[in-house]
Amino acid sequence: MAEAYDILIIGSGIAGVSAALSCRNRGKRVAVVANSLESQSLYKAEKITNYPGLELTGRDFAEKLQEQLDNCGADIIKGRALSVLSLGDSFGVAVGNDFYEAGAVILALGITRENLYPGESEFLGRGVSYCATCDGMLYKGKKVALIGSSAEAVEDVRFLREICSEVLHFPKPQRFEISGGMKVERLKAGQEEYAVDAVFIIKDSISVSKLADGLERDKNGILVDRSMATSIPGIFAAGDCTGKPYQLAKAAGEGNIAALSACEYIDKKGV
């Protein structure tokens, strides 16, 4: 028999942890499907400078979030959610070979980046960044490169040129390779190689998860309303999987809103 919860949260980044804390504060029985701490992009961030009241490394921040999650009373399910199925008045969630039931589901999936450049994953948090406004000040007065052609990328180039000594902008697709020692030192673009201190990669990345049939999405991510409700009643979404901006404060706030909305949904059903 499937184990049943009031609310099941898929994802244990800041949006998922925020949602779990808020659901537990409302007295709900909660489970969180969590990947390893080390696999989270937050864990690899060099420094967190854009979250109010905190200034610490991504690893320290991620570990504090994990500690809060471990102590909040939610059940932690290690693994990867494979599907979310409607069971009428509830949802079934497959995680590996196990099956769980919940009255409501919160998707806090983050984003999945595909077609990584050589060196991109290796140097993430050590000179590779996906957010110029988050990490740009770490490279004040230094030489950086930005890969991207979107309107957001153009704005980021303008921002970086105000604080960096030199900004190399690569708007056209080509073969890129990032290399260095402990940190980024070089970017190879085509046949040319450039000495840089950081590489900002601005992609239109979205979650590629297709967990639930009928879940409406656009090019930015899962479509939600102001209550973080998706197109499927009882399924809510929060954080990077709902689209830009990819910011910690946004993810935390959306996690809280999704949790309160899910709790209200459960209460109205009388689950």
Q: How would you name each of these model-derived features?
A:
Residues M1-L8, R26, D75-K142, R186-A189, ...:
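FAD-binding core/adjacent interface of flavoenzyme oxidoreductases
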Residues Y5-D60, Q68, K142-K172:
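Beta1-alpha1 glycine-rich phosphate/pyrophosphate-binding loop at the start
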Residues G11, A108-G110, I147, F200-K203, ...:
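Short, well-ordered coil/turn residues at beta-beta hairpins
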Residues G16, S83, T112-R113, E152-A153, ...:
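Glycine-rich nucleotide phosphate-binding loop and flanking beta-alpha elements
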Residues N25, E122-L138, I202-A249, E254-L260, ...:
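FAD-site-proximal beta/loop scaffold in flavoenzymes
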Residues Q40, N115-L116, V154-E155, S209-K210, ...:
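Glycine/Thr-rich phosphate-binding loops of Rossmann-like dinucleotide-binding domains
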Residues E63-K64, L69-G88, G92-A94, Y100-A102, ...:
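A Rossmann-like FAD-binding core segment of flavoenzymes
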